[in-house]
From Swiss-Prot:
The keyword Ubl conjugation applies. GO terms for molecular function: DNA binding; DNA-binding transcription factor activity; nucleotide binding. Pfam families: PPV_E2_C, PPV_E2_N. Keywords: Activator, DNA replication, DNA-binding, Early protein, Host nucleus, Isopeptide bond, Phosphoprotein, Repressor, Transcription, Transcription regulation, Ubl conjugation. GO terms for cellular component: host cell nucleus; host cytoskeleton. GO terms for biological process: DNA replication; DNA-templated transcription; regulation of DNA replication; viral DNA genome replication. HPV16, in comparison to HPV types 6 and 11, is more often associated with malignant genital cancers in humans. Part of the antigens expressed and presented within HPV-positive head and neck tumors. There is a cross-link at K292 (Glycyl lysine isopeptide (Lys-Gly) (interchain with G-Cter in SUMO)). The keyword Phosphoprotein applies. This is Regulatory protein E2. Plays a role in the initiation of viral DNA replication. A dimer of E2 interacts with a dimer of E1 in order to improve specificity of E1 DNA binding activity. Once the complex recognizes and binds DNA at specific sites, the E2 dimer is removed from DNA. E2 also regulates viral transcription through binding to the E2RE response element (5'-ACCNNNNNNGGT-3') present in multiple copies in the regulatory regions of the viral genome. Activates or represses transcription depending on E2RE's position with regards to proximal promoter elements including the TATA-box. Residues 1-200 are annotated as: Transactivation domain. Belongs to the papillomaviridae E2 protein family.
Length: 365
């Protein structure tokens, strides 16, 4: 008993020293979590020996001590991975590596530089929710560390890693609870993101690097301007038949630009539907995805889609274009979706081989 008391005193003194020093050195924070793990181990041993109090402190149950020890081990190992990377010399506060921040969405990641995103439901300023987004999210994978930026769009908070868009907060979840009309607007960085059927535009928003790269590879886009934080509007000039009157309908349709491989993240843009040469805002139009490539690969891929059946409405059999001008007879599989949001989720969650070309669009049914 006396030995346990002495060890606990030394351990807790060291923990208090870390609080007082307020260090910005990652090595000190690794040592802090090492002693937090040791404290849990001492409590666990004391409880095993039948002690319910030690040094006038209540000894937690075995389950509580074990759970906290596992969390301390996880954080210690995560920080050691970051320490062995190029980010070890950054300034790190004890708050940056706290358990509370670690468990905040996206969970299981070290994060820094948080800021508030406000979501207003049903246009009611009194019916709002606040979420935390992060400018630096550290994703640890085995011995490597990648830093990504938290981004925001109408659907939620997300980051893009290895070409995959991952949402760690989805606004529709709270809309189900607090919104009558299931409509909201997002306030972030001094900008407002409205429902995709009425996209707010501003020339003051800087577009992310990934969109600049995409537009550089797609010269067909003749005019660009910022739409909202993390997105950019691309308006392509489409010749309207002279006989068709201009109704002035402000309806917009959100559309995903074509991506050539899984490494290209889906990019949301907005096309003004007054250009009716291609897109119509009627109820018979459904979002689609064409997958083009080797027939056998597509057949295997279509079989794998069964476990993602909630992310699409229907999938076609393998088909080909025919005609004397068709030079490349690649196989095609087409998927349809109930909404563009469902299509976005499919493209962000389903792994598509790099040998398959992915293109998006709309089809009247």
């Amino acid at each position: 008993m006396e030995t346990l008391c002495q060890r606990l005193n030394v351990c807790q003194d060291k923990i208090l020293t870390h609080y007082e020093n307020d260090s910005t050195d990652l090595r000190d924070h690794i040592d802090y979590w090492k002693h937090m793990r040791l404290e849990c181990a001492i409590y666990y041993k004391a409880r095993e020996m039948g002690f319910k109090h030690i040094n006038h402190q209540v000894v937690p149950t075995l389950a509580v001590s074990k759970n906290k020890a596992l969390q301390a081990i996880e954080l210690q190992l995560t920080l050691e991975t970051i320490y062995n990377s190029q980010y070890s010399n950054e300034k790190w506060t004890l708050q940056d590596v706290s358990l509370e921040v670690y468990l905040t969405a996206p969970t299981g990641c070290i994060k820094k530089h948080g800021y508030t995103v406000e979501v207003q439901f049903d246009g009611d300023i009194c019916n709002t929710m606040h979420y935390t987004n992060w400018t630096h999210i550290y994703i640890c994978e085995e011995a490597s560390v990648t830093v990504v930026e938290g981004q925001v769009d109408y659907y939620g908070l997300y980051y893009v890693h290895e070409g995959i868009r991952t949402y760690f907060v989805q606004f529709k979840d709270d809309a189900e609870k607090y919104s009558k009309n299931k409509v909201w607007e997002v306030h972030a960085g001094g900008q407002v993101i409205l429902c995709p059927t009425s996209v707010f535009s501003s020339n003051e928003v800087s577009s992310p690097e990934i969109i600049r790269q995409h537009l550089a590879n797609h010269p067909a886009a003749t005019h660009t301007k910022a739409v909202a934080l993390g997105t950019e509007e691309t308006q392509t000039t489409i010749q309207r038949p002279r006989s068709e009157p201009d109704t002035g309908n402000p309806c917009h349709t959100t559309k995903l630009l074509h991506r050539d491989s899984v490494d290209s993240a889906p990019i949301l843009t907005a096309f003004n539907s007054s250009h009716k040469g291609r897109i119509n805002c009627n109820s018979n139009t459904t979002p689609i995805v064409h997958l083009k490539g080797d027939a056998n690969t597509l057949k295997c891929l279509r079989y794998r889609f069964k476990k993602h059946c909630t992310l699409y409405t229907a999938v076609s059999s393998t088909w080909h274009w025919t005609g004397h001008n068709v030079k490349h007879k690649s196989a095609i599989v087409t998927l349809t979706y109930d909404s563009e949001w469902q299509r976005d989720q499919f493209l962000s969650q389903v792994k598509i081989p790099k040998t398959i070309t992915v293109s998006t669009g709309f089809m009247s049914i």
